[in-house]
């Protein structure tokens, strides 16, 4: 019996032994990370939610990577990753052979008008230029409008088949800031 804990800041998952009969009871018995051997950079950035397909395969939401790491439970190694075409996946769960993933920021066809351009026509003014690039003080109380545009995606829930790890469905119009399931 184990407890897997995501360490959002330290880019890892700690595996804690819950077997009261073992001397390692309530101790970290493994740390799951994924470091690129050449660059020495993490490929396991900001883990959040954890869900298990079964006793062999786990999923870990990597919020800043916009990916889900697929972890072999026995070896505790990342075997592949699933790309989430939305920002900051956090909430995940497995039910009936389906992996459900929700991103924290899903857009809902909206964008701050001061945000960077998507198609060159969405930004009513460039808040980055106004507040950051050309302003040597923090613009307290700076206000931007929210612009709705049909080309900005609205992707709220991603459904994967846990046997194939293939994306099988995307659901929209659930909300803008999605905190969990």
What do the predicted segments below correspond to?
Residues 2-5, 57-60, 99-101:
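Conserved beta-propeller blade signature
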Residues 76, 122-123, 147-162:
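Beta-propeller blade signature
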Residues 18-21, 72-76, 161-165:
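Short loop/turn segments that connect beta-strands within beta-propeller blades
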Residues 24-40, 77-82, 166-171:
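A short beta-strand motif characteristic of beta-propeller blades
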Residues 102-151:
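Short, conserved, GDST-rich strand-edge loop motifs in beta-rich repeat architectures
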């Amino acid at each position: 019996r184990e407890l897997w804990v995501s360490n959002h800041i330290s880019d890892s998952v700690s595996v804690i032994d819950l077997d009261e009969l073992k001397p390692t009871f309530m101790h970290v018995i493994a740390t799951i990370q994924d470091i690129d051997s050449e660059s020495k950079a993490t490929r396991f950035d900001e883990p959040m939610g954890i869900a298990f397909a079964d006793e062999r395969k786990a999923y870990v939401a990597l919020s800043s990577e916009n990916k889900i790491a697929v972890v072999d439970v026995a070896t505790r190694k990342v075997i592949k990753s699933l790309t989430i075409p939305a920002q900051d996946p956090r909430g995940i769960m497995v039910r009936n052979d389906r992996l459900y993933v929700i991103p924290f920021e899903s857009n809902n066809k909206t964008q701050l008008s001061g945000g960077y351009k998507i198609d060159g026509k969405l930004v009513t003014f460039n808040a980055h230029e106004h507040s950051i690039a050309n302003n040597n003080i923090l613009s307290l109380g700076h206000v931007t409008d929210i612009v709705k545009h049909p080309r900005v995606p609205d992707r709220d829930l991603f459904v994967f088949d846990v046997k194939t790890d293939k994306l099988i469905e995307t659901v929209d119009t659930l909300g803008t800031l999605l905190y969990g399931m």
